[in-house]
């Protein structure tokens, strides 16, 4: 059957959307956990938890959709990426488990709340760092021979992957801080605003470092970003990042509440766009394209029919949950 569109590209966009939705939605959840050690035990931590309590578990739906979509639609990529990145992926899942268990148990087990707070912060840190390391390892390249992973167990651990991991930790913390600026008031909001200002500078620095190194990882990255005439187009991305960072700084200094979080989301969108510019149309950079990794056309059609029903439902209940639980929160708002 002939279509006026490329099914494989459509699926690549669907999975990219799911991954981005997970990054920004669960990103501020993880950011709350990363900020937990600097929040005062008691009211501040309870308020921060209540700000994400109604939505945090639903946010992880997008991770399931992205991972499940990769397995179903791009099975070759799944078969190559998973063995290459077993360690950071397992670490991420363990971190998410610790974070989720601690989230609920700290309310039900007040005698050991301090221990659950440590588990919540530690799980958030491990999950965020592992996600960044996974991304960094994928960007730097995976050894492939034929249709299988050909590298070693520790190939994922490099200075670049650690840099990307640390950068994502800082970025998630920025999302968490701007979320608290939007959802809280009083002393906690003022404290979150101060942290957000510092984290803005740290995030921009991290983006600059990763962006400076990435073009030299592979020849195709260099060609995309620095070779003429491509640079005339791609140079707009770092320019927009600089403008977004300045707008974020201005709104934080100016006392805005919602704008900083929205601009921080825009900053993540720009970095995600930069990632797409670097790797598309590859799913394993420099090794496997989306067309080489794709499932048969019949499978893609069947799965797309299901996704066309499922994704609007997820978007609808997510939007409804955020609408119902909008507004300011306090230490007694949810649990």
Residue spans for each PLM region:
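Juxtamembrane membrane-water interface segments of multi-pass membrane proteins
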Residues: 30-54, 71-81, 104-114, 176-195, ...
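Membrane-interface helix-loop-helix modules in multi-pass inner-membrane proteins
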Residues: 55-126, 145, 224-232
